[in-house]
Amino acid sequence: MHEKKGGGYDLRQVQYPLGNWPSIYVMNPGNPQWVNYLSGSINKVYQNLRFDGYHIDQLGHQREAYYVNLKSKKVNGKKVYTDGDRRDTHDFEDYFAKFINRMKADNHNKYLVMNAVSTFGGAKIVGTGNVEFGYNEMWDGDDYLWNYRKIIQDNRYNNGKNTFNTVFAAYLHCRNGNGGQFHTSSALFGNATIFALGGSRIELSGDHMLFTEYFPDNARKMSEKLQESIIHYYDFLVAYENYLRDGNVETSVNMTMDGVNVAAWDLSAPNPSVAEAANQTIGPKPYSVNTYSTTKGDVTMIQLLNYNNVSRDNFNIRDLKETMPEPNVLKNKKIVLDDATSVSRIWVASPDYLGGAPQEVVFSQREGKVSFTLPSLAYWTMVVVEHGNKADSSETEVKNYVLQGESFVEAKDEAVAVGEAYLSFPATVAKTLHASLPLVPVTDGITNVTDNVRTGYYTVSGIKVDKPVKGVYIHNGKKIMGK
């Protein structure tokens, strides 16, 4: 039973309307009879279908109170409910945890995840230790860049493991009334921020990008550029996961770019005296390149996020207004980093440059200052600083090669198509290489053919084959053409 807005009480099964579709019944996860019923139903599913587990969903904080132990009286021969024991809906947060623990106890070998809609019940959910990762669906009051970092850190704290990960559902341009293609810069700035902070994102369903919580809805499309870029971003997320979210500890660095201070992400807690989340000034600084930095062992990871033409009004992920500008791409910027510890190696990588291939950079270190040149910064570039003694006191070099035809050719710029192969060589090897590396040995021709007793057919590379096909072969000391 729930209080009516106009007074009195409403006794009915609460439903969440879905337009022309059947409504969803809203159940009380603290009701033991319902939990027992659902547990039995889930067990039947597991007995007949080989699911690995299931996703538990909720609707967030919908109401302030509900009533149990209802009281009634007869009015004109009809039962009328008049009162009951008022309960706070925040009780549901504890109910969520008990529900998760019950489901895990019933099927300990199955996996669970539960959506903390707008963080409702989030601490209790991840605190069970029985969900595989934090899952947070972000809506209007949550969608602030500083809040994404806070949720990632809160989930790790409440779970008790610094390696605990978080996945966000933040639907791009959700129901803003517009059609057409997604805003590419909105998608890439959002992914750059979430991934750099150590999070992940659920935004793809089949072959399309999500813009509502109804996953089959594919009314909005990705541009060709976004389709290509999104592959680079997810390749990058997987390739460098140990540098992004593997128990790293937050830190801050002092850095200049062409002599101008680079802003460090403000890691402060929200100001409790500021009522509106939109008015918080923590997190990144607008109209600036920002760093978000972590350490692990002797390695410091510096995430450079290029907000140099982004206002605070655009410091959200979903970009309902579709006003996120494209970044001003920065090239060959001189970086000076404060670091008193001996640096052995620096390399950079970006999903926006060379398909994410790592590039070792030349650097010098004097009196606690490390200087190097940053090749490129579009949306996001990661700088990895490794500490320790240098194996070689000479300046470091690196060469990256992109497959073109039957050779790997030294990469000169960032124009790399999706799906191409890359080679990247360390400094000691790079100095010995040429600008082109053929896949097969190159010969100037066949000379000094000597007849011998060996029979069979040999390729020009000296490989014996049983039956020649098209090409040039050596047989009984003579050159022949296979047809």
Provide a role label for each language-model segment.
Residues M1-L49:
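Active-site-adjacent "subsite" loops/lids of carbohydrate-active enzymes
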Residues R366-G388, V418-A435:
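C-terminal beta-strand-rich structural cap/linker in extracellular carbohydrate-active enzymes
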Residues D91, Y95-E137, D142-Q303, Y307-N314:
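Active-site-proximal substrate-binding groove within the catalytic cores of carbohydrate-active enzymes
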Residues I346, N389-E420:
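Contiguous ligand/interfacial binding patches
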Residues S344-V370:
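Solvent-exposed beta-strand/loop surfaces of large extracellular or lumenal domains
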